[in-house]
């Protein structure tokens, strides 16, 4: 007799935590596996995991890095959080991890004063559009989209247009 509940064990839960400087290279390797995200230098990922620990988040499963959110407070608008990248390992996609990472990040006590979330997305990145549209719906559908960096004007045709998605957050994230 086959016992399906034994054959298909549920996945272990994700563990969310702040990155440390020691995580920089693992983050760099994760992002390399997460097309269509732009690969930044390993140095950049070390800075994200050390200088921006309070606004970045890692997700691990069985002590393996499966997700990372890089974000920062905008220098001139400290109550606005800019989400730079949301990376999910191919093995963890389609399970709601990206959304859970954003929710855990926004639930941090030291980010309780964040009133606006921003990100940029290229037209072709459908996974990111779905993710941020879901968050926008949850927050009352007050989000707006505008051109941030134009393919022709800013990138001379070398990169797709980046659209700025701005989502006002309700007081209880």
Swiss-Prot record:
Annotated keywords: Acyltransferase, Transferase
GO molecular function, one term: diaminobutyrate acetyltransferase activity
Residue ranges occupied by any N-acetyltransferase domain in the UniProt entry: 14-170
Organism for this UniProt entry: Vibrio cholerae serotype O1 (strain ATCC 39315 / El Tor Inaba N16961)
Protein's gene: ectA
EC number: 2.3.1.178
UniProt lineage: Bacteria, Pseudomonadati, Pseudomonadota, Gammaproteobacteria, Vibrionales
Pfam families according to UniProt: Acetyltransf_1
Protein known as: L-2,4-diaminobutyric acid acetyltransferase
Family designation: Belongs to the acetyltransferase family. EctA subfamily.
Pathways involved: Amine and polyamine biosynthesis; ectoine biosynthesis; L-ectoine from L-aspartate 4-semialdehyde: step 2/3
GO BP: ectoine biosynthetic process
Gene3D superfamilies referenced in this protein's UniProt entry, alphabetically: 3.40.630.30
EC category: transferase
Domain of life: Bacteria
């Amino acid at each position: 007799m086959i016992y399906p509940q034994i054959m298909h064990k549920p996945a272990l839960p994700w563990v969310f935590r702040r990155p440390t400087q020691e995580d920089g290279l693992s983050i760099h390797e994760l992002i390399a596996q997460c097309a269509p995200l732009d690969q930044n230098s390993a140095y950049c990922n070390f800075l994200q995991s050390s200088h921006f620990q309070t606004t970045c988040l890692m997700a691990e499963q069985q002590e393996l890095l499966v997700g990372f959110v890089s974000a920062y407070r905008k220098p001139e608008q400290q109550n606005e959080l800019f989400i730079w990248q949301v990376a999910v390992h191919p093995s963890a996609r389609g399970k709601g991890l990206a959304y859970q990472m954003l929710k855990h990040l926004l639930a941090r006590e030291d980010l309780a004063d964040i009133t606006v979330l921003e990100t940029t997305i290229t037209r072709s990145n459908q996974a990111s559009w779905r993710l941020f549209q879901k968050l926008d719906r949850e927050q009352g559908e007050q989000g707006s989209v505008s051109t941030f960096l134009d393919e022709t004007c800013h990138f001379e045709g070398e990169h797709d247009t980046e659209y700025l998605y701005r989502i006002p957050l309700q007081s209880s994230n």
